[in-house]
Amino acid sequence: MRVGILTFPGSNCDHDCYHVVKHVMGAEAQYVWHKDRLPEQLDAVVVPGGFSYGDYLRCGALARFSPVIADLVTFAEKGGPVLGICNGFQILCEAGLLPGVLMRNASLKYICKDVTIRVEGQETPVTRGLAGQSLTMPIAHAEGNYFADPETLDRLEGEGRVVFRYVGGAPNGSARDIAGISGGPARNVVGLMPHPDRASESILGLEEGKRMFAALLG
């Protein structure tokens, strides 16, 4: 299993994702610079967190125009597994791979804390065998308030594409307590604001995010 880790100017969680995939899970991982083509031999792609392009204009808005995004869209449309974490979720929304947008937190403050999310909806590449489970992992964002129009929210709910929901209410004001959603032809594109990459080793105090990487790597 070979996983590509996209890297943009301002990414800072690409190393975390690389470490988990390669050193914790024992799979092959390679960085993919935003100006390069997506290697054809990849089995999955992770769009990591960080502050791509310094979050100028809007989170993910500039990264959406990076050359690698066209290849990412093609990869996703062919059913390739794509996981977007935090800023990666924002980028996937800006690129049109997932519906909706991530707005400023309702508190207008940066939030960094552990949260518990519940796995819901239909199975995806990162939630195989995890339905109904609660996972605890950190969030660290200022723009994690998921918003979509009521029709889109109803469609996501009806199609089972609300993949993760905050337990006890969304700390950022996210609509319907949504923490993550899926898209793509086979629910193969998943975006979420919490960081499974920061909850995959005992030394960090949390290992429940490791279950998501185990599902992704099959």
UniProtKB/Swiss-Prot annotation:
Q: Can you list the GO cellular component terms from the UniProt entry?
A: cytoplasm
Pathway given in the UniProt record: Purine metabolism; IMP biosynthesis via de novo pathway; 5-amino-1-(5-phospho-D-ribosyl)imidazole from N(2)-formyl-N(1)-(5-phospho-D-ribosyl)glycinamide: step 1/2
Catalyzed reaction equations? N(2)-formyl-N(1)-(5-phospho-beta-D-ribosyl)glycinamide + L-glutamine + ATP + H2O = 2-formamido-N(1)-(5-O-phospho-beta-D-ribosyl)acetamidine + L-glutamate + ADP + phosphate + H(+); L-glutamine + H2O = L-glutamate + NH4(+)
Q: Superkingdom, according to UniProt?
A: Bacteria
Supply the InterPro entries for this chain: Class_I_gatase-like, PRibForGlyAmidine_synth_PurQ
Q: Name one GO molecular function term.
A: ATP binding
HAMAP family per record: PurQ
Q: Which NCBIfam families match?
A: FGAM_synth_I (TIGR01737), PRK03619.1 (NF002957)
Protein name per the record: Phosphoribosylformylglycinamidine synthase subunit PurQ
Which organism does this sequence originate in? Anaeromyxobacter dehalogenans (strain 2CP-C)
Quote the gene name from the UniProt entry. Answer: purQ
